[in-house]
Amino acid sequence: MSLLFPALTGGPGERVALRFGERSLTYAELGAAAGAVAARVRGAGRVAVWATPELETAVGVVGALLAGVAAVPLNPKSGEGELAHILSDSSPSLVLAAPGARLPAPAAGLVRLDVDARGRGDVPEDRAADTDPALVVYTSGTTGPPKGAVLPRRAVAATLDALADAWRWTADDVLVHGLPLFHVHGLVLGVLGPLRRGGSVRHLGRFGTQGVARELNDGATMLFGVPTMYHRIAEALPEDPGLAKALGRARLLVSGSAALPVHDHERITAATGQRVIERYGMTETLMNTSVRADGEPRAGTVGVPLPGVELRLVEEDGTALAAYDGETVGEIEVRGPNLFTEYLNRPDATAAAFTADGWFRTGDMAVREADGYVRIVGRKATDLIKSGGYKIGAGEIENALLEHPGVREAAVTGEPDADLGERIVAWIVPADPQSPPGVEELAEHVARRLAPHKRPRVVHHLTALPRNDMGKIMKRALSNS
């Protein structure tokens, strides 16, 4: 029996576990296919997984976990330099891939095992300890090469069980999404989550509003997405009443990986009657907070700490903040069973990430409301702007800018200013490129909605904002442009 996935042997074997397009596997079939992989990789140390959005990726990862072997998911879109670094750093014994998948040069030198989604094997007895590594997931290399966060089996189980409590997630739920499978969001939450519950996941292969509507109309109960996906939904809703009706059928709409703009929240709710809930996590911590299914779905917040997660806000000197006033900004630190154990081969970076008493420094800045709801204001390195003696979060200014009818997309950064320390800079994609709003118009708009000291002093007009695979705006690319 698998302690991570008891439904592989203890549930109804005929229930569909995975569906990717027209291909699907029942729990009995998944157990057999993953069992066959497990038999071949047992004792391998670490295995890389070429994480294409296919059945074979899910089978490969589950097979590695059944064998007690850590899986290293690889982004198929990685450049050769980054891929070479990840493979050199993680030293996998072999690479699991779908038959026919073409591997680039850095991976082509590894022993390759093609995953047979119709393989036949037995689910092995689970002998792994909860402290054993489950996954090594590489973080974005914003200040250097990517670091491999080692996620223990304990963290995967703890975060998925906490989300089950918060979201009332059961075996009856059918999840639909089109997320990449080399990140925590798509792989851990989007594939391992349904499998731990004994439910089903339908992967779209590639996100599209028509696919979302089709699956929700065909019995799917939950939708996971990133803000870019929900923005596309919000844009499509006025012309697609069928999409609105389908979304109205969902039990739960969940957004993560970056903040969902309040404007998109409001447009989706107005058209569907549904509210999108947000959660907050990162590679090193898995999930920390969420709006609960039975809680108040408050746009612009990421809810309350999940069961088992301790969360505090601290000053720059590490002093804990006691304020629950919705205004006092501090860095989020977390502690709990959901945390990673180390950065692979990076003891100095691991030590620097934790306080002496075991709190992980997230680098995310937030405020807490009176009832404990957490509102992220941005990253400490890129989103906290110190201007005129104020600590200002970029996120609330971005939301205010998006309320302006002339703004389609917005990002906010700070840049040095001799008088203010830093001045606020807005980067916008105008709704009408022929008539973009100017700095005075946007400054007045923000000052009226927030406060004068939060108004942008500089505005840049762009055709698009740079984003990564998960839809996050790459602010360092803006600042360096």
Task: Give the role of each language-model region.
Residues 312-333, 352, 370-371, 433-439, ...:
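Conserved beta-loop-beta connector loops within the AMP-binding
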Residues 221-225, 235-298, 310:
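Gly/Ser/Thr-rich phosphate-binding loop
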Residues 14, 121-138, 145, 168-174:
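Conserved pre-ATP/AMP-binding loop-to-beta segment of ANL
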Residues 157-174, 182-222, 236-237:
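Conserved AMP-binding/adenylation subdomain of ANL enzymes
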Residues 324-340, 359, 365-366:
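AMP-binding/adenylate-forming core of the ANL superfamily
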Residues 26-28, 134-158:
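Conserved AMP-binding A3 loop
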Residues 49, 336, 341-342, 365-454, ...:
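AMP-binding/adenylate-forming catalytic core of the ANL superfamily
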